[in-house]
Structure formats: C-alpha cells, structure tokens
Amino acid sequence: MQVNDPVSTIMSTSVVVANKFHNFSEVLELFSKHGMHHLPIVDGNGHLIGIVSSNDLMKVFTKPEYKSLSLNTDIADKVINIPDIMTPDPITLSPKDTIKHAAKIFDEKKFMAMPVVDNGQIVGIVSVKDLVHLIAHYC
C-alpha cells in the first residue's frame, strides 16, 4: 500500500447514516448500537447534507439553551433538530483521492473522520483510525 493509493482502498464501506428527520434519541441509539463516533446525515434522496460527531452530541448538554434538558431524551426529541447540531456540508473525499491527500486534510483540519462521496452518494468513510492501522501495518 502506498500513500498515493486511493482512499477507496482503506475506507469503511458499511456506513451507517441517519436522515435529517431522525430524532435525537434515534441518533443517540445509532451511536451506541454501532460504536461509532461520526454519523453522516442525508436528505430524502440519500445525498450527504451534514455530519454529527460524538462531540456534537456531548455539546448539546453543555449549551445554555439546552441546560434544562438534563439527560431526558423525551424532551430532547421535541426540542433538538438534528440539522441544528450537525456540521452542514462537511468536507468530503472522493474514492479516487489519495491516502496522502486525506492525511493532509486530517492534519490541517484536525478532523477524525471524513465521508467518501461519489456522485453525491456516500460510498464510505475514512477515519484517522484507518490511517493509524495502515501505518502500523506497513511500518
């Protein structure tokens, strides 16, 4: 494996996504059930419109406007809309982008994961963890 190989060679292809109409507790359940740290958000046509990180979920309970929520997801479901907590229009990779290019973005932007998109559809996700596994395997 070379740094000039495409990210498609290291990306995870079984990507769990949520749509913008999922409620807060459904998103929490996806994070918990799948042990994930990043959840791509799609519109009704399956096009990527945002991403929610585990940090975004934790920030909900520290924001003054959500202070009264405590850990009550029934109330949170009524008050919090996923588009309000997601990062809209996230930086993405193409399956043809190089591993080196992905590593550069991770370093510059301090991201931990990026969706891989082809023709507007999510085809994978690449994480810093994927790069660490690659380095460990080949060093």
Give the predicted meaning of each segment:
Residues 14-17, 47, 92, 121-122:
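Short, flexible active-site loop motifs that bind/organize anionic cofactors or intermediates
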Residues 1-14, 54-91, 98-99, 103-107, ...:
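Tandem CBS (Bateman) regulatory domains
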Residues 31, 39-56, 106, 114-130:
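A glycine-centered beta-loop-beta connector
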Residues 25, 45, 49, 75-76, ...:
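Residue-level signal for alpha-helical context at structural boundaries
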Residues 18-35, 42, 83-86, 92-110, ...:
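The conserved cystathionine-beta-synthase
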